[in-house]
Structure formats: C-alpha cells, structure tokens
Amino acid sequence: MPPENMFETDVLIIGGGMAGFFAAVKARERGVGVILVNKGYAGQSGQSPWADSFAAFNPEWGHELEGWVNQVNRVGEYVNNREWTELCFLESYARYRDLVAWGVEFHRTEDGDLFRSTSSLGPCQALFTPPRAHGPALRKEALKRGVRIMDRIMILELVRQDGDGVITGAVGMPVAEDGFLV
C-alpha cells in the first residue's frame, strides 16, 4: 500500500457526530494525536445535526439524579445501562458548558433566562438550540484543537493486533475515489 494511504495516530475516532467530536476534543486536551473519520461530512451528517435539544442535569436547577435516571430507564424499557445513564447525566452539565464556550447558542426566555422544558414523561428537562447548531461549532473546535478530520471515508474493517484482539486501526475507502486507506 502506498505510504500516502497510511496514517498513524494515537487515537482514531470513527464517527463525526456529537459523541465523536467530544471524544476527539477531550483526547486532544490530553495532548495525543487524533484522527476523526466520518462517512459523510463530519458535523453535518448522521443524526447529530438534527438534534435541537440537550439534556443538561444540574442539581443547582433543582434536578434530582434518581428521577432523571428512572425516567430514562422507564422510557428505554429498562434495556439501557443504569450506571452509564448516571454517568452521562453527571457529565452533561459540563458538556453543556463546553457547547456554550464553543459558540452554541441556547434558546432563552423573554426575560433572558435559559429556556428549559420539562418532559411530559418525567422530570428530565431539555435545553433547546437553533436547528443544526451543534455540528459546525463542534467541527470548528476540533479543528482549532488540532484534530485531523477525514471526511467521506467509509470504514470497512477494524484492524486487530495479532492474537490478543486489540484494535490497532481501521481500513477505509474514500466514498468518491478508488483505493483504500489504513
């Protein structure tokens, strides 16, 4: 394989949605090299661009963790991991603050307060953004931090280290070109 088709990095992230971008930025904060690969245009493909709300758990707003976790468990028909749900909620306010710092605007009331809407299914509250607000802000922040973004690459296979099953890379194919990338 030609060397120009081979890439090396400390962290490879497959998927350019909200989770992929947060993982990329947080890895760069630790000083490691990061490549983010996405089958479309990272930040504007998949489901993340359509998100117009964000659940930010904050005890200072009167939120109670048990109620939030119970709502997600019930609505998810108890197939989700409860500990993972708790962790996501406990980290959510910090991620909200990151989004604000990176330029994502959230809707406010006429009085200028943050607009929070409580779910009809339980105590969880959502914060709302204009349509397609997350993706461009996440992409801009990732690039600013030095994340290498590779758009329109379809990952075909994960590369495993001999014998122990550790993932050491991936093989991908550019969507609009011939050839493979490793």
Q: What are these model-predicted stretches?
A:
Residues 3, 39-174, 178:
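Conserved N-terminal/central alpha/beta ligand/cofactor-binding core
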Residues 3-4, 26:
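Short secondary-structure boundary/capping segments within folded domains
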Residues 1, 8-15, 40-41:
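Generic detector of short alpha-helix boundary/capping microenvironments
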Residues 2, 16-17, 180-181:
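Alpha-helix N-cap/helix-initiation motif
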Residues 5-9, 177-182:
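Core beta-strand elements of the Rossmann-like FAD/NAD(P) dinucleotide-binding domain
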Residues 10-36:
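N-terminal Rossmann-like FAD-binding beta1-loop-alpha1 element of flavoenzymes
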